[in-house]
Curated annotation (Swiss-Prot):
This is SUMO-activating enzyme subunit aos-1. Heterodimer of aos-1 and uba-2. The keyword Ligase applies. It holds the Pfam family ThiF. CDD domains: E1-1_like (cd01485). One of its GO terms (biological process) is protein sumoylation. GO terms for cellular component: cytoplasm; SUMO activating enzyme complex. Transmembrane segments: none annotated. GO terms for molecular function: ubiquitin-like modifier activating enzyme activity. The gene is aos-1.
Length: 343
């Protein structure tokens, strides 16, 4: 299915940016987004504007009252509290781009047995898992790797957030320099004069990506890694990893004071494992309350923007995707791109 003339008029600017071939690939893509909170809203908006063929939006949870003023997809003039998160977002997304087919799934798809989950995931071009537990994210990632499906995950923890990318085995454009013209002239002295004109070209290259589990359990003990840990491992990584671990180990109760107490020893362990020192961490435990919400809007916007960018790049097989863990911290208004496990 190719982009119609009517769609060409709608997508004219982005077609000028990445070309008709890329837009056709986007037009034929089917995307699954699991998780309809702030981060999901940012990603869904970007992919809707890009013009994917289908977006399947999964979330069985009802809208929380505190979310209504934080999620721009919700209509604050109506009572959203009795609706599931994506159902409350439907009208905004439908009117944003009516060429995109929207499918709202109001059930907990990841609670099904493994064979049912696997069968469900195989029909998608890209799977995006947001604000989910470590175990569920890892399970979906393993299935996607098995079936060669592009995978992205991410989460927001108050003022910090992360995005993980796994495009293992997919090909993308990378820069390649080749001589366009070679002209050699012999001078009277016998020396060779060489004139070379180099044009910048792009070639397809297949990329290898580590899994979610491999990335989030990076080993920093190798001697050559220890020496450069303070340079390649951002301090915000330890906050993200600690939150993932606390959730995985069922340490979080929903009571912020208690959760901070449970988080501190985990954070201490992660900082030590990353060859950093506690006293050099810019975010100390007295600020850990910022990790438990409400989520910081600019953090969701930054992480969601990067996810949307890489999703489009991945689907369209564009230029050189990021590899492989992006972390944003609202404490310092800084984003870090990590290539983990480090080599």
């Amino acid at each position: 299915m190719e982009v119609s003339k009517a769609e060409q008029a709608i997508y004219d600017r982005q077609i000028r940016l990445w070309g008709m071939e890329a837009q056709n690939k986007i037009r034929n893509s089917k995307v699954l987004i699991i998780g309809g909170k702030q981060l999901g809203a940012e990603v869904a908006k970007t992919l809707s504007l890009a013009g994917v063929d289908e977006m399947h939006l999964v979330d069985h949870r009802l809208v929380d009252t505190e979310e209504i003023g934080m999620n721009f997809l919700y209509d604050a003039s109506v009572d959203n509290s009795k609706m599931t998160k994506w159902a409350a977002s439907y009208n905004f997304l439908y009117n944003l781009n009516r060429n995109v087919k929207l499918f709202i799934v109001e059930e907990d798809v990841l609670s099904k047995n493994d064979s049912e989950i696997e069968e469900y995931l195989t029909k998608f071009t890209l799977v995006v898992v947001l604000d989910e537990s470590y175990e569920r994210t890892a399970k979906v990632n393993n299935i996607c790797r098995k079936h060669h499906i592009r995978f992205i995950s991410g989460a927001i923890y108050g003022w910090i957030g992360y995005a993980f990318f796994d495009f293992d085995g997919h090909a993308y454009l990378v820069k390649a320099k080749s001589p366009d013209c070679l002209n050699e002239e012999e001078s009277e002295t016998g020396k060779t004069s060489t004139v070379v004109t180099v044009d910048e070209e792009f070639v397809l290259e297949t990329f290898s990506y580590p899994s979610f589990v491999e990335t989030l359990n990076s080993d920093f003990t190798a001697k050559k890694i220890v020496r450069k840990c303070k340079r390649i491992v951002p301090t915000s990584y330890f906050l993200v990893k600690s939150m993932l671990r606390a959730s995985s180990e069922n340490k979080l109760t929903g009571v912020t004071e208690n959760d901070i107490e449970k988080l501190i020893p985990i954070w201490n362990e992660e900082v030590a494992a990353g060859n950093h020192t506690i006293d050099m961490q810019p975010v100390q435990p007295d600020r850990f309350d910022h990790l438990f919400g409400p989520n910081f809007g600019p953090t969701a916007a930054c992480v969601g923007g990067v996810i949307g960018q890489e999703a489009i790049k991945s689907i369209s097989e564009g230029k050189n995707p990021l590899r492989n863990l992006f972390i944003y911290t609202g404490f310092e208004s800084t984003g870090f791109m990590c290539n983990f496990p480090p080599v």
